[in-house]
Each structure stands twice: as structure tokens, then as C-alpha cells.
Amino acid sequence: MLVEGSELQSGAQQPRTEAPQHGELQYLRQVEHIMRCGFKKEDRTGTGTLSVFGMQARYSLRDEFPLLTTKRVFWKGVLEELLWFIKGSTNAKELSSKGVRIWDANGSRDFLDSLGFSARQEGDLGPVYGFQWRHFGADYKDMDSDYSGQGVDQLQKVIDTIKTNPDDRRIIMCAWNPKDLPLMALPPCHALCQFYVVNGELSCQLYQRSGDMGLGVPFNIASYALLTYMIAHITGLQPGDFVHTLGDAHIYLNHIEPLKIQLQREPRPFPKLRILRKVETIDDFKVEDFQIEGYNPHPTIKMEMAV
């Protein structure tokens, strides 16, 4: 198709997929679609799932933060886990000590032994997300080793490229390292993210190979939205969009009834996220630097984690 030169404007708006009035409706419609059309599949945990392959949603980060409201999302867990990733830690006990126990089951003695990691300390998850983000390609020894200067610091390279060459199409961070997969307590579900700069805004697209719609996906949406806010802050940009692309999007069979309750609820306005001080580097962020305002979710819905 030919386009008249007068229509080509450097300041043209970024094309956006059609999104419903409230961003959360995208998530709820995905859940409804999987319940209606999903294929019943067996899975690693033995729980069983309803599964659909290939879904996408776009959440605006402009003056709102996509922390789902049709149930309470564990904001403290989102924040502490992301700071733990950024630190490069692979020690589940560091999170546990802060009241965030989402990695406890995968770092337990029984689980590690079941994978053949009997020589590994309890809590040592292997070269998972934080290690790949900050030390990709380094040889993993254990969770207590000092990896300073080893491997590729993908996160810092992302930040540096956004500052120096924002139009680059290779602003990518990848946690999927085939060499290290056999050493991980859990291979990465959220595998690769790409950043995009236009009109002074930073957007992020996540490719998530495996999405647990009941428990994991609401958490992952908030986590990568938060990462986008953080990187935008230190690169002098405004948050744009978070685009969430799912591979195997699934509902565990024991989550169907809880999710039916969630689908009956009307979304409430998304909260706002404030960063309370000027932070210069990604490693300097602290828990107290963030404030969620106006979060008024529906009550918690209990769902069991499949391990």
C-alpha cells in the first residue's frame, strides 16, 4: 500500500490495539475465553488445565497502574520480588525473611531433592531470573557466590541503550538461557521483554511462555508495569504501555470456581503509582520509594499454587 509523504509524521501516535474502556476487562475477557474455548491439558504439576495458545493485552501506564481490582493483588510481593530480581539474587530465603513466600515451595528441601539438587542448600533456586538479568552467561555455582563483573548485565545494557540509542530495536532482556535451564528450580515463565521509546514514553512488551491466569498473570502484569515505571524514571521518560503476550495461557482446574467468582465482579479504577524520590540508578531503588494510591480492590480470592 502506498502512503502519501504528507501522512508520514515523525510525531504520529504509536498504533494501539483496541482495548476496552477499563484495561482490566482485557484480563477478564481472556479468562472467560479460556473457560469457554480452552483445551483440557495435563501439566507438569498433575493438576490439569484449560489452555489457549497465544493471547495479548495492552495496559496503559499513563497516569494509572494496572494492579487488578477484581481481587486484591499482593503488592508487597510484587515489589519485593522485583527488587530481588534486580539485585540478582537466587536465594528464596531472602524473600521469605520479608514475608514474601511465593518462592518457598520451589526452594524447599523436598522440591530441590526431587529435581536431583540434593547438594544444594535449601532456598537455592539456581540461575533463575535475577541471575540471568544481571549475569547472563556466567557459570552458576551457588546462591552465595559473588558474581560481580561476570556474565552480561542485560538490565544495565537495556537502560544504557534507552539513554544512548532509544530508537534501537534490540532493547531486549531475556531470562531463557538453554544452557542453564537444567540448573533452575523452575524455568522462566516470563521469558523475554523488549522496550520501545517514542514521543518521550517508554513501553514494554513481555513474552510469557506460560501464564497461570489465576495466580501468576495478575502478579506478572503488575511486576513488568513496575519495571517499566522504574526504568522510565531513571531514563527521564514517561511510562507508556505494557503489552502482555502470552504463549500457553491456562487456568488450573482447581482455579475455575474461584475465577468464576472473580468474573462476577466489576473492575474498579486502577490505582496510581508514585515514585517518592529521584533515583539515579536501578540498583538504588528501595521498597520505601514507592507508593500505591487509590487502590480499592475487591476482597482476596484464595487459589492454591500448583507446584
Swiss-Prot record:
Stored PROSITE patterns: THYMIDYLATE_SYNTHASE
Source taxon at top rank: Eukaryota
Region spans: Disordered: 1-22
Cross-link Glycyl lysine isopeptide (Lys-Gly) (interchain with G-Cter in SUMO2) per UniProt, renumbered positions: 286, 302
Active site: 189 (nucleophile)
Major localization listed first in the record, in broad terms: nucleus
Subcellular localization, as worded in the UniProt entry: Nucleus; Cytoplasm; Mitochondrion; Mitochondrion matrix
Enzyme Commission (EC) number: 2.1.1.45
UniProt: (6R)-5,10-methylene-5,6,7,8-tetrahydrofolate binding residues: 212, 306
InterPro entries linked to this entry: Thymidate_synth/dCMP_Mease (IPR045097), Thymidate_synth/dCMP_Mease_dom (IPR023451), Thymidate_synth/dCMP_Mease_sf (IPR036926), Thymidylate_synthase (IPR000398), Thymidylate_synthase_AS (IPR020940)
GO cellular component: cytoplasm; cytosol; mitochondrial inner membrane; mitochondrial matrix; mitochondrion; nucleus
Keywords (A to Z) from UniProt: Cytoplasm, Isopeptide bond, Membrane, Methyltransferase, Mitochondrion, Mitochondrion inner membrane, Nucleotide biosynthesis, Nucleus, Phosphoprotein, Transferase, Ubl conjugation
Phosphoserine: residues bearing it: 108
Matches recorded under Gene3D superfamilies: Thymidylate synthase/dCMP hydroxymethylase domain (3.30.572.10)
Assigned protein family: Belongs to the thymidylate synthase family.
Role according to the record: Catalyzes the reductive methylation of 2'-deoxyuridine 5'-monophosphate (dUMP) to thymidine 5'-monophosphate (dTMP), using the cosubstrate, 5,10- methylenetetrahydrofolate (CH2H4folate) as a 1-carbon donor and reductant and contributes to the de novo mitochondrial thymidylate biosynthesis pathway.
Quaternary structure, from the entry: Homodimer.
Annotated protein name in UniProt: Thymidylate synthase
